[in-house]
Amino acid sequence: MRRDITQWYSERLYRDMPIVSYGHYGPPVLMLPTAAADFLEYERFQLMGTLAHWLDNGKAKAYSVNSVNTLALMNKQTKPREKLEWLKRYDGYLTEEVLPFIKNDCGGVDVKPVVMGISLGAYLAANVFFRHPERFSGAVLLSGTYDIRGFMKGHQSEDLYFNNPVDYLANMQDGRDLRELQHGGKRIIIFTGQGAYEDPARSRQLAGILGSKGIPHQLDVWGQDVNHDWPWWRKCVPQYFGQLFGT
């Protein structure tokens, strides 16, 4: 499998930010890591090998980047306003740095990636997707949480509202973003298990909000033996690649 690593200094995040790509060409998928992990996490946990059929045959090309979870949501020493500032900066990094890089890497065509994330990465993927639906063709959200108020120690602000998908989606009124989500042909896949450390209520809540807004989506709730762990994600992600990019 072709594998290339690039990095550049991000003025938004004040640090070098690496990005790894897998495959030669094909529709792009932007993969955001779980919790405190880094851009090579999907490779270390052997997920990329399960996608070789698509990545080696030009059916898809995958990109993975670092997150800011250790600076933001998972940083217990940081005040809520600072956490939200990091999330805003990360949103700018993804939309104004990573997406242009992917476009250039794909030959300059106006590509719209699928964005994917697992666990806290699913939150990051959902947030950038629902805030900028015109920039993406779909989202694959695995075992995620879509309400970050539990990380905010009771803090309330406009910045929290606009970075909390269950809030701003529930109140989304007729407008460009809602029409894009309703009629833009997006593929939204929400996955959860019901086993150890999974919380299917979070995925059902997001799906319920999308349904109430007439936003097409797919909710997959797997069994009570399906835990919040890599063996199950290695099983479901190839299935979703098959749905998105063909077998």
Where are these regions (language model features)?
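Non-catalytic cap/lid and distal C-terminal segments of serine-dependent acyl enzymes
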Residues: 1-247
